């Protein structure tokens, strides 16, 4: 038994589950005409319908009691106050300070961090204006037309997702490119599209030692210098987001063009910081500020709304209901908007790197499930790929259906078809189709007898598949900021319930350590390290293939 599983609310929910697991949402809707109105809420430009979940008032009552018994109120306050809730690294967790639009003091070790936050935002704004206005010129006195962001993980996924999502708001002269993969192909193909005279490289690495990022950055630098043939020109075409001024200067980047962030900003929560420089360059300072404003709206709601009307808390606790009671090991993100095509990958890192943990804060092994596998694709594409499994497969995979009510970028007639599919899928997942309904349908098609009965089981949909429908008034910087912050806080809440640290990522370290040794073997700097027979054979195959 762990701290969590000993809580009275945890045990009470198991008693409730014994009855609730037999309920069907179709019956719940039939018995309660007001269900949709009661199980929905709006925050800023976001509307959440969570009525199509396997929940009742008793379920929600039990889940909110579990949140309180797990200490969620105190943990929310601790995060916003700047307490060092990342215990394994002894750090505060203050991505919320980066969008603290009230500018009220937030202290770390007694120091108000807001002056530094505002100073970096001001520098970012001035630089973005210079690039966007054409005042910032390359080594041949031409304005910048292409921006190549070089980073990985949180230094790539966040800026890439936001720039893709808000493309209609981007500067018409600027083309955005993102390079993260160290395989060489991504950088090679990117460099084919850009010109050294008009390209700005943004190198994003907190330590400026990340192997993948530095490998790509050095290769980009070599490519640039092969054309510019002047080391001094690097300063006009490379800027850095880092904390390592010495390494940045050695690279050839003017320290005046290094934008700082801090150890209380986790990588996957960093797009609000200087890591968001590519976003500001592309969208402009005003739109970046709107992104922050949207996140701040959700922050204030999360801090102040009662749990029963708190959007992040509701999503988190309903998620706990499926993960820990129904055994639902995956969760689907299905945005019905092509501009949001990178959102599933972004949420995947945000959730799985945060809560994919096997021990509690006290270091004890968990005796319950933690983070689900997050996956997904744009909704329409998903319907023709994996929705078959979601409708008739054997897994319980809750689905977030995300769309915008207004879409200024859509072509005439397209948006209505899109939204019809969103609403239809939510209804289909909930209702399903009974055997009698299938028989009636087949009878209308002229089938009967054995021929009909042979088809019936294949065309039955069990329904009772949970969905959340998240609708934005429109996809714009403010609403996207709120949406991202919603998921950040949902993930935080689940981490609190499970008594785990959502803000470290030790699981990524072992592979990095082993890769250094194996790299030395592949490049001939080390003859043979100790490995298992499989790894040794793989190394031998590489050596044989490469002479």
UniProtKB/Swiss-Prot annotation:
Could you name the active-site residues?
Answer: 353, 384, 512
How is this protein annotated for GO cellular component? Answer: cytosol
Q: Where in the cell is it found?
A: Cytoplasm
The pathway to which it is assigned is:
Carbohydrate biosynthesis; gluconeogenesis; Carbohydrate degradation; glycolysis; D-glyceraldehyde 3-phosphate and glycerone phosphate from D-glucose: step 2/4
- Note the InterPro entries from the entry: G6P_Isomerase, G6P_Isomerase_C, Phosphoglucose_isomerase_CS, SIS_dom_sf, SIS_PGI_1, SIS_PGI_2
Question: Which Pfam family, any one of them, does this sequence belong to?
Answer: PGI
Q: What is its EC number?
A: 5.3.1.9
Name one molecular function that GO assigns to this entry: carbohydrate derivative binding
Recorded catalytic reaction(s): these are: alpha-D-glucose 6-phosphate = beta-D-fructose 6-phosphate
Keyword Transcription regulation (UniProt): no
Task: Enumerate the UniProt keywords alphabetically.
Answer: Cytoplasm, Gluconeogenesis, Glycolysis, Isomerase
Its signal peptide is none
Q: What is the similarity comment for this entry?
A: Belongs to the GPI family.
What does it do?
Catalyzes the reversible isomerization of glucose-6-phosphate to fructose-6-phosphate.
What's the protein called, per UniProt?
Glucose-6-phosphate isomerase 1
């Amino acid at each position: 038994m762990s701290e969590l599983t000993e809580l009275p609310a945890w045990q009470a929910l198991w008693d409730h589950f014994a009855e609730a697991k037999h309920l069907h949402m179709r019956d719940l809707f039939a018995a309660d005409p007001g269900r949709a109105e009661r199980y929905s809420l709006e925050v800023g430009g976001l509307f959440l319908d969570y009525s199509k979940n396997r929940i009742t008032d008793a379920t929600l009552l039990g889940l909110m009691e579990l949140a309180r018994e797990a200490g969620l109120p105190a943990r929310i306050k601790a995060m916003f106050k700047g307490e060092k809730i990342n215990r394994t690294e002894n750090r505060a967790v203050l991505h919320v300070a980066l969008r603290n639009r009230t500018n009220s003091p937030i202290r770390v070790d007694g120091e108000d961090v807001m002056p530094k936050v505002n100073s970096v935002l001001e520098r970012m704004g001035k630089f973005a204006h210079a690039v966007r206005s054409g005042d910032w010129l390359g080594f041949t006195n031409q304005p910048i037309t292409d921006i190549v962001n070089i980073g990985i993980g949180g230094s790539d996924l966040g800026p890439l997702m936001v720039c893709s999502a808000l493309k209609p708001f981007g500067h018409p002269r600027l083309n955005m490119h993102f390079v993260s993969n160290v395989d060489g192909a991504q950088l090679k193909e990117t460099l084919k599209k850009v010109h050294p005279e008009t390209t700005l490289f943004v190198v994003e690495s907190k330590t400026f030692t990340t192997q993948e990022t530095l490998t790509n950055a050095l290769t980009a630098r070599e490519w640039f210098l092969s054309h510019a043939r002047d080391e001094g020109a690097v300063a006009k075409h490379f800027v850095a987001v880092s904390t390592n001024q010495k390494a940045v200067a050695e690279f050839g980047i003017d320290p005046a063009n290094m934008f700082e962030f801090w150890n209380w900003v986790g990588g996957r929560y960093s797009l609000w910081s200087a890591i968001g420089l590519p976003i500001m360059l592309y969208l402009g300072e005003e739109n970046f500020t709107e992104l922050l404003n949207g996140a701040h709206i959700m922050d204030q709601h999360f801090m102040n709304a009662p749990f029963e009307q708190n959007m992040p808390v509701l999503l988190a606790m309903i998620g706990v209901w499926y993960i820990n009671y129904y055994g639902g090991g995956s969760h689907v993100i299905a945005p019905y908007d092509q501009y949001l095509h990178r959102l599933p990958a972004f949420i995947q890192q945000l959730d799985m790197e945060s809560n994919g943990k096997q021990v509690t804060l006290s270091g004890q092994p968990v005796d319950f499930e933690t983070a689900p596998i997050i996956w997904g694709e744009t909704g329409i594409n998903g319907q023709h790929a994996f929705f078959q499994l979601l409708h008739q497969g054997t897994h319980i995979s809750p689905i977030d259906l995300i769309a915008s009510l207004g879409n200024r970028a859509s072509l005439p007639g397209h948006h209505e078809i899109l939204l019809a599919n969103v609403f239809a899928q939510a209804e289909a997942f909930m209702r399903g189709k009974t055997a009698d309904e299938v028989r009636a349908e087949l009878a209308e098609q002229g089938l009967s007898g054995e021929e009909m009965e042979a088809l019936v089981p294949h065309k039955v949909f069990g329904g009772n598949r949970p969905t959340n429908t998240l609708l934005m008034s429109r996809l714009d910087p403010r609403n996207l900021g709120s949406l991202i912050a919603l998921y950040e806080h949902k993930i935080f809440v689940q981490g609190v319930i499970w008594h785990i640290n959502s803000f470290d990522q030790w699981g990524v370290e072992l592979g990095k350590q082993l890769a250094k040794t194996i790299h030395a073997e592949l490049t001939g700097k080390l003859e043979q390290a100790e490995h298992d027979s499989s790894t040794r054979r793989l190394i031998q195959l590489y050596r044989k293939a490469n002479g």
